[in-house]
Amino acid sequence: MLNKFLISLGIWVLRLISLLPMPLTRALGTGMGLIAYALMSKRRHIGMVNLNLCFPEKSLAEKQRILRQHFAELFIIGLDYGLLFGASKFRMRRLIKYRGFANFEKYYKQRPIVLLAPHFIGLDIGGNRTTMDISGYTMFSEQRNQYLSERVKQARTRFMIHNGGEIFSRQDGLRTIVKKMKQNKLP
């Protein structure tokens, strides 16, 4: 019961923050990210190990700058998740723009397409925006907390349900989506 309350409170706070002007949200997220960078030594260490493995040629100062920027971006997008839970279609369309969508549409109208996207920061918001314009299926990862999982699923499907889309658990695998596409002849 307490978990549900805290999750609902967190979502409510994110929705309120999402009403702020974007520059203010960015500044708040950057500040929170830099505080987290200073306090979360274990996460900072993991990030530095990864940067050392990927970019051995970069200086320590450059890797620290990249890592601080990552923490800032992570918190910015964390605050932006309020958009998933409450932003209007109008606001989502105004904030999130496509580049090269005509290329996608050209093929989408001809045959089914599987659009694979690596799960970088902010993918959920871009996916949510895309489902306003095209029918399709998407995947999500089940959360440890079932209530949170259901709320995230609701948020990610709130535009998609109007155009025939559906969401599947990542644990079901890509084959499930491909099978559904063939059944419904949905691109």
Model-derived features: positions:
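Membrane-proximal helical "anchor" segments flanking the first transmembrane region
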Residues: 1-114, 121-122
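Soluble catalytic domains of membrane acyltransferases
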Residues: 85-187
